[in-house]
């Protein structure tokens, strides 16, 4: 668990300090260029350790929104580490980026997943159920992969 930008903004809205989640105060507090920036850079464990931990817990390691956090340059390394899939269809990726990620996933035999990036009441934009769904064939591949992992675990 942690405290994120959205939680701080929620508290500021509740206290009547601002009425806008993503307005001027948000920019002052969370824009790296702002002199009033309160962001503390977190320290993370390495990608390989994360993938190993997910696999150790019986999970499927999927790289979420690869373009949003500039993860694309590391894809070949993540494949070497054993990543299982890539979030191809998501609001933060353009159609061209989605095509590139789908091609990459297929050429490296990775699962191709869709996700809404829905963060509840903290979303900046409107995302409807099904807007970024995983196509049926790719969903079946995910389901089959999950079944294979369960059988392997027994």
Where are these regions (language model features)?
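Charged catalytic cores and adjacent phosphate/nucleic-acid-binding surfaces used
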Residues: 48-52, 56-60, 67-154
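Conserved acidic, metal-coordinating active-site core of Asp-based
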Residues: 1-62
């Amino acid at each position: 668990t942690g405290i994120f930008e959205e939680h701080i903004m929620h508290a500021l809205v509740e206290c009547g300090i601002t009425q806008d989640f993503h307005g001027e105060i948000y920019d002052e507090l969370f824009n790296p260029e702002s002199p009033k920036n309160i962001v503390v850079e977190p320290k993370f464990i390495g990608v390989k350790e994360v993938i190993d931990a997910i696999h150790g817990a019986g999970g499927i390691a999927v790289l979420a929104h690869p373009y949003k956090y500039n993860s694309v340059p590391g894809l070949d390394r993540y494949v070497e580490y054993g990543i299982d899939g890539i979030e191809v269809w998501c609001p933060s990726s353009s159609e061209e980026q989605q095509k590139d990620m789908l091609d990459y996933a297929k050429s490296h035999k990775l699962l191709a997943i869709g996700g809404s990036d829905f963060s509840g009441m903290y979303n900046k934009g409107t995302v409807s159920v099904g807007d970024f769904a995983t196509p049926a064939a790719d969903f079946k591949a995910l389901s089959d992969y999950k079944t294979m992992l369960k059988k392997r675990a027994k």
